[in-house]
Amino acid sequence: MDASYQPEQIEAQAQRYWDEQQSFAAREEREGEKFYCLSMFPYPSGRLHMGHVRNYTIGDVISRYQRMQGRNVLQPMGWDAFGLPAENAAMKHGVPPARWTRENIETMRGQLQRLGFAYDWDREFATCDPEYYRWEQWLFTRLYKKGLVYKKTATVNWDPVDQTVLANEQVVDGRGWRSGAVVERRDIPQWFLRITDYADELLEALDELPGWPEQVRAMQRNWIGRSEGVELDFAVAGHSDTLRVYTTRPDTLYGVTYVGLAPEHPLAAEAAEGNPEMQRFIEDCRKGGVAEADIATMEKRGMDTGLKAVHPLTGEQVPIWVANFVLMEYGHGAVMAVPAHDQRDWEFASKYGLDIRPVVHPSAEERADVSEGAFTDDGVLADSGEFSGLPSAEARQAIGEKLEGLGKGERTVNYRLRDWGISRQRYWGAPIPMIQCPACGDVPVPDEDLPVVLPEDVDVTGGGSPLKDLPAFYQTTCPQCGGEARRETDTFDTFMESSWYYARFACADQKGAMLDERADQWLPVDQYIGGIEHAILHLLYARFFHKLMRDEGLLQSDEPFRNLLTQGMVIAETYYRERGDGGKDWYNPAEVTVQRDERGRPVSAVLEDDGEPVVMGAIEKMSKSKNNGVDPQALIDRYGADTVRLYTMFAAPPDQSLEWSDSAVEGAYRFLRRYYGLVRDHVAAGPVPALDVASLDDAARDLRRKVHETIAKASDDVGRRYTFNTAIAAVMELCNALGKAAANEPSGAARAVLQEGLEAATLILAPIAPHVTHVCWQALGHDEAVIDARWPAVDESALTRDTIELVVQVNGKLRSRLQLPADADKAAAEAAALADEKVQRFTEGKTVRKVIVVPGKLVNIVAN
């Protein structure tokens, strides 16, 4: 071994060995139970950030641990390569998106390899590869023929900056999730996948995913939003039209005081004819998005149409209002408004002076107070005709039956979930494989013409997709009639590619099919790792896509991911100065000097360049916008990959936020250097005799017990609890104990325990710091590489103790500690405690009233 810890040399040596041996190539025929570990693949933005490093280190530690358990492990890596940033970069730098993307992939692949992740690189692909997205196009045409794909003109969220449609999930606080632009409503022809056909299965199967965080399952349940209610019809006075509405609260039907219409509703358009004020209001409503969360928080506005709706049970006429909070895409574009029992309706009615009529009360004796807000709980009906006096639950059933009997409504199930709009008016995405023929309509591209290849040598200038200006791309002939036709110029939502990539990794080299029998061998993924921000986007779409592929006969399993780990964010301090224009200039923590008080708490900060103060902001997620990121490459260059890996696993449990600390990174480096030195000095001391447990003295026996206690703890922490930080802490404690023992120049028998302890520490650290342990394992005398070694086993006999330590308290205060035989009973413990000199100093002259013995732990003496 080298005299000093040289990370760069050690890591190059280990990686060279893994490459030569093809250590991480997954083989279907290999013995052992399969284990498929997958971290969400990255968008090739150009460089790894610390969030990537944390995510992929967690996955790599789990993969390497499972390999040490004898399992046949698959851990692949690829690239989620389509998306808007490539187009933005093309406009900014004049580089085609394809070239920008592939150059970034080269850079990031090198960074991942430098970190020593155990990926099977033979399975690598990028979603922008035509041989990948051809199968996505192929499946789309199958779904079209099944009726699971359809096209309709829909009111959509339009991002005016990115010039594309956004799914509701991609609108955050009324703004586009990438551009930050205020979203508008537009009517655009769109392609949709019928995810609602799978709503019940997607909902019910959540109960079969106990390995998922309950928070994620709850988010999906809420997003799917199954509800049981009634669809009912309000006639329009003086019109042949009826308005169909859906309600989960038919028990409040007698409290309806107005009906709300979506601005896009045909009746609203009719009311606006010859009414410029109404036309302006409807146009103004279209400036907001159609995301439900944003509708809920915006100011409620409306206009009276002058039309009246006829109550289906009482015949009462109530006003019809156009309201900006009613969505055409939800229900039927109309809502029955019950201000007394719905807070949104109450706010609207209060603003415009509409009636508020309570018809449900907390009890028969207690009236609902709706002067300050709606009463939204269940209760007892009043002023509701024949249904007065019924509890809400009974009234819902009875009123539903009444409406059905009159032919004015029906009980039904509804969902918040909408069909998935997958059309995007962008260039850098997979082309939608449809052809528009004047004679035949929409026609899918035949299998023999797939893939529809995205032309890569184009100029991206903004203002929408360049495909619509490329006759060479869109001019084609109809597959059915042979006439002139036009190719679809929209591309798939990029969530399409990430909805099935995990399955393609099982058979990435398959040229003749989307998937083959290897998909059933590897799927479902045993451990999936990624951020909770994907709970209702990627994770729901992937579950849906898995069921589509199953029903196409491509695989047999029902769910894609057996277990899900949602890792916490990497967070760091932020510093800024206010600009004159109200904006902020953000400074990287490395540019700032922080002054701290005597307890180490930050009190002020100055910029190193000029010595002037900066404002200490919140501790936030590392981001470019806040300039509080740390470059992983700089850390690797300075400390080595193993230090970066060790720090990310030690700083916090994987599901919690990791607060960045430069000093803790330095501490991780010092520990690895100390561990390396322990092995080096031990090896330099010469040959080690075989372990003879019978010949060990008490000190060696205690050290051996520490070794096996550490193995037991680490096995549980890494294998079951995923609390890698506590496993690392246990190894650090063990190394401290080994270092103390080594300093005492141990005998031959004790050196055998040192050998056993260093081997155990090496094996436990191997998944976390694989490079230095590769070198140390060989130095400890092993012919096989540590990558092929098994996880250490606990010797239960080593855990037994001849003596135990008991804490002795007098009146609840610690007064002494006793060493007793491990088999000492309560009486012996009590007698020893009362006879102890230290204890007697506190019981002398007092009467012992009670002695409480907790076996193996403590004795508490009550005396006064």
From Swiss-Prot:
State where the protein is found. Answer: Cytoplasm
Enzyme class, one word? Answer: ligase
* Cited Gene3D superfamilies: 2.20.28.290, 3.10.20.590, HUPs, Isoleucyl-tRNA Synthetase, Domain 1, Valyl/Leucyl/Isoleucyl-tRNA synthetase, editing domain
Where primarily located?
cytoplasm
Q: Which domain of life is it from?
A: Bacteria
Give the location of motif 'KMSKS' region in residue numbers: 621-625
Q: Which SUPFAM superfamilies match?
A: Anticodon-binding domain of a subclass of class I aminoacyl-tRNA synthetases, Nucleotidylyl transferase, ValRS/IleRS/LeuRS editing domain
Q: What's in the GO CC field?
A: cytosol
Transmembrane feature ranges: none
Annotated HAMAP family: Leu_tRNA_synth_B
Q: Which family does it belong to?
A: Belongs to the class-I aminoacyl-tRNA synthetase family.
Q: What is this protein called?
A: Leucine--tRNA ligase
**Natural source organism:** Alkalilimnicola ehrlichii (strain ATCC BAA-1101 / DSM 17681 / MLHE-1)
